[in-house]
């Protein structure tokens, strides 16, 4: 028997109903803020991710699912490991920034070759939200406020903690990177193996090392906050002021750097204590250089150039402001199951059972009910015996079963059985057409 690939999971109907419920709440909040839905390809050119994410990141070096197509010459392609790069590519390709400040959201699968564990899979799903065109700190605060409202709507507000940091501008990070490398080079032998490698490829990622020994070394390391310019400091302080005015609590985490190279200024994470090591549920920040950077992609070796850029922090391209976040849906559902479980959502409200001799009348009744009550989920079984159909009705989770036999046809009535109490009554054929008589369960 062929089975699903390791790290790629089926989402079966009972669980899928909870996914749809979650996605509807998230979409509702996004609609309240005026964000528009965009659908993006799951496959992009490999160069896009190498340039956007950074050639020295774990994602590009070790985690991407890449292949070449059958064109001549072959084109290197990659299953998307994240959504921001594709969203920026779409904004550039379709000139969405021309005279506008698009606010977009998307939802769907992402792919990374990682060791599968609870809350971390090789195919996983993200909600991505991107706001383009504003360099002002209110755009940062708006996204954070939006996520705060999402937690409130999902009953998770008390389970989430907001962490903030500022990465400053490119030249400020470059100066800090040099100071950090100088400090750590003398202590290189005390670093864990990953941090030793990152010292020459992506030293800022050492700040979020999970190794206690490395964190101990960082206590006396130079602080990024001391390298920020006046404008970066003012921007970050204004974000904090907005959040305070909105009543959103936060904590400053000076080691928060994020795992993608495109971020600048504000970065943030929503974390929880309920999911063990997979504590981050939502994360994002500002990426003012990425739109302009991807506009300037040429035919050079993108991965090699991205590594060179990460090392030398080359001359910045024109700033095209943007800010966004991504939310892991698997982790979010794990958190919901732990603290505010979504009740089982039945796939059926009304089950129609019809005697085989009048089965066509049952089909007609069910179809008319679907027209008159589009809010109801109406099911029927095949034209087997009444007993067999009733067994299926019992298993369906329906609140009511409508029974139609010759007697009901003659009397122009229906028999209605309450599946919870077992009580049965006779009613007019149009009884269920009146919402006052029966409302569907949420």
UniProtKB/Swiss-Prot annotation:
Single GO molecular function: ATP binding
Catalyzed reactions per annotation: tRNA(His) + L-histidine + ATP = L-histidyl-tRNA(His) + AMP + diphosphate + H(+)
This protein's UniProt keywords: Aminoacyl-tRNA synthetase, ATP-binding, Cytoplasm, Ligase, Nucleotide-binding, Protein biosynthesis
Organism: Psychrobacter arcticus (strain DSM 17307 / VKM B-2377 / 273-4)
Protein's cellular compartments: Cytoplasm
Subunit structure: Homodimer.
Taxonomic superkingdom: Bacteria
Cellular component terms (Gene Ontology): cytoplasm
First-level EC class: ligase
Family indicated by similarity: Belongs to the class-II aminoacyl-tRNA synthetase family.
EC annotation from Swiss-Prot or TrEMBL: 6.1.1.21
HAMAP family, A to Z: His_tRNA_synth
InterPro entries in the cross-refs: aa-tRNA-synth_II, aa-tRNA-synth_II/BPL/LPL, Anticodon-bd, Anticodon-bd_dom_sf, His-tRNA-ligase, HisRS-like_core, HisRS/HisZ
Protein name, as recorded: Histidine--tRNA ligase
Listed GO biological process terms: histidyl-tRNA aminoacylation
